[in-house]
Amino acid sequence: MQNLYLFITIIKKSDGKEFLDFFLNHKVAPIYSTICHGAATSETLSLLGLERSDKVLMQSIVTTVKMYELKAGLTREMKLDLPDRGIALAVPLTSIASKRIFEHIINEQNNDIPENFVIPERKIEMELIIAICLKGNSDKIMKVAREAGATGGTVVKAKGTASESDMFFGMAISDEKEILYIVSRKEKKSDIMKAIASYTNEHGTHPLTFSLPVTETAGFRLLE
């Protein structure tokens, strides 16, 4: 069966239209976008005299062939390998609920497969760590993650949808949340997650933290 991936791109908000056009030109749709920001601490930003700038997180479902096409295009056309340009990563999916949607993605994206295309052998070397925490806690969690080896992160604003009475380890599910995305090397994942767990247990905050495998990346100059 043709493999599918969640393809995530994080860029500056001011570059959003340019990258959207890139994806549409490469026949990738639909694209789901949300505003986010980098996880630099407020103290660091103040020290450097900077303001927290908005970013855009774009997500779409792509095939194996399209994933490699996008990775090459993002580097060649969009210069994603340049500093502060952005990052991209692919997370493998194990299933998709709708057979019709699955077939639509396959048919739309695999029309122009190169005749000599060979899927490279993949070795999982990166992980996407996701921590869902109460609003205002992402800076503190990112600080301990950095101390454990994380090089950066991205924060997305979110909100729980359960009733106000529902609690999860003392955290009201319906409260405003922050979702922290951290991409790390596989060998550093355990240290980072243990550091987050140790800090949150000590301070009584209990984010939901988990990790996903990352098969391909672009723009990670410090990690690749």
Model-inferred region functions:
Residues 1-224:
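Positively charged, small/polar-rich N-terminal and surface patches that mediate targeting and assembly
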